[in-house]
């Protein structure tokens, strides 16, 4: 019998997840389909009960439900609990277990796409929202030397560092981070600044950027933000958000099926869809 997977969120119609997952199911000969489930904010509990009742094998969870699903699950793994958000649920015979593959997917994409190890690296993360949380806690599980946080409201960055690792992390205002740019090997934008349709704005001035540094942006629409274009012009190696999108999906796929999908194929499909 064909297994059912899907995405729970609101809205979901623009998601590229069905494209990635259904192609991977077909290529690996797995009898399964991935669907979109639009779930309004008041209906999260009912939707999760539906996953149980209908025997849906697994779901991804997107905005605005990553926090709201947690009370309805039987178990939440430690990494997801620490982040305070779930993006992947597995249905083990009616027992629902929540995971978070966002930050882990980001870190794996960064290492594989840039062909680096994070050991000993000094990293600056811009932003302190949901995306930043997942990435920050995932970076803490690597051997990076420093993971510093910069945010418009410094208090949010401070809270994150206090929850994380105050020995390896400091927190700054954006203005202070701009003066310290030369200290870092990797600079990551986790905010939506520069995303379509407001493509003219940039999260941080790159005036003091050293050539050869990696500049990474989790935005994938546009594929190359104005900020990444400038970083490239200043001699940086750049990475867009397609890798994170694909690898968080691939990690969820692996949790559901026990098989690792063709991530290069997934990337190609996503880029083609974004260019349409």
Swiss-Prot record:
Reaction(s) the record says it catalyses: shikimate + NADP(+) = 3-dehydroshikimate + NADPH + H(+)
Binding of shikimate, residues: 15-17, 62, 87, 102, 220
EC number: 1.1.1.25
Binding-site residues, NADP(+): 78, 151-156, 218, 241
Keywords: Amino-acid biosynthesis, Aromatic amino acid biosynthesis, NADP, Oxidoreductase
Annotated HAMAP family: Shikimate_DH_AroE
Subunit structure: Homodimer.
The protein's name in its UniProt record: Shikimate dehydrogenase (NADP(+))
């Amino acid at each position: 019998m064909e297994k059912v997977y899907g995405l729970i969120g609101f809205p979901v119609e623009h998601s590229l997840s069905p494209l990635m997952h259904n192609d991977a199911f077909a290529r690996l000969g797995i009898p399964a389909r991935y669907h979109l489930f639009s779930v309004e904010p008041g209906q999260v509990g009912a939707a999760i009960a539906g996953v149980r009742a209908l025997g849906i094998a697994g779901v991804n969870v997107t905005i605005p439900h990553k926090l709201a699903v947690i009370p309805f699950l039987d178990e939440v793994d430690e990494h997801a609990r620490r982040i305070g958000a779930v993006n992947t649920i597995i249905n083990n015979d009616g027992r629902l277990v929540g995971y978070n593959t966002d930050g882990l997917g980001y870190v794996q994409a960064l290492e594989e796409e840039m062909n680096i190890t994070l050991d000993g690296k000094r990293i600056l993360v811009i932003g302190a929202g949901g995306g930043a949380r997942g990435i920050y806690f995932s970076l803490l599980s690597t051997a990076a030397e420093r993971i510093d946080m910069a945010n418009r409201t410094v208090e949010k960055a401070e809270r994150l560092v206090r929850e994380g690792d105050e020995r390896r992390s400091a927190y700054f205002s954006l203005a202070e981070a701009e003066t310290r740019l030369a200290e870092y090997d990797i600079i990551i934008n986790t905010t939506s600044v520069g995303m379509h349709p407001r493509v003219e704005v940039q999260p941080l001035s790159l005036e003091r950027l050293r050539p050869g540094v990696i500049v990474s942006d989790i935005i994938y629409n546009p594929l190359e933000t104005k900020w990444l274009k400038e970083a490239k012009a200043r001699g940086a190696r750049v990475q867009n958000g397609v890798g994170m999108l694909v690898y968080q999906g691939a990690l969820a796929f692996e949790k559901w099926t026990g098989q690792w999908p063709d991530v290069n194929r997934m990337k190609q499909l996503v880029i083609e869809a974004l260019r349409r």
